[in-house]
Amino acid sequence: MKSARRRSRELATQGLYQWLLSGSPGGEIDAQLRGAQGFDKADHEHLDAILHGVIRDSEALSAAIAPCLDRPIEQLSPVERAVLLVAAFELKNHVDIPYRVVINEAVELAKTFGGADGYKYVNGVLDKLSAQLRVDETQAARKR
């Protein structure tokens, strides 16, 4: 059974995918997500925080992700880009969620929505990004 937070991440990823492709306003995407299957079982507060936070901070999040990539962020598939934006937002703004949980959730999103091996790429990028955004937490985990 999926947790309410996982459902909120799934819906946020779907909404951000739509936003990346269409450029629709966040409020319009939000309204569409409220009618989506699984919305009733999602953590609405977390969904709103991710969706609107990523749209608001997309340039800064993309700038944080860019040095961890092997190609320009614009060349990523929209699914991988949406997943990475969700994870970057959580790494940056939700320090209550352990970085390993953020990475694992992103890998699961990439497996669900992305291409065959996209999850491996997402995992590698987020490993680098978490080392930059969560220095103390990642260093402590690596010493164990």
From Swiss-Prot:
Keywords: RNA-binding, Transcription, Transcription antitermination, Transcription regulation. InterPro entries: NusB-like_sf, NusB_fam, NusB_RsmB_TIM44. Gene3D superfamilies: NusB-like. It holds the Pfam family NusB. Disulfide bonds: none annotated. GO terms for biological process: DNA-templated transcription termination; transcription antitermination. The keyword ATP-binding does not apply. HAMAP family: NusB. Involved in transcription antitermination. Required for transcription of ribosomal RNA (rRNA) genes. Binds specifically to the boxA antiterminator sequence of the ribosomal RNA (rrn) operons. This is Transcription antitermination protein NusB. It comes from Paraburkholderia phytofirmans (strain DSM 17436 / LMG 22146 / PsJN).
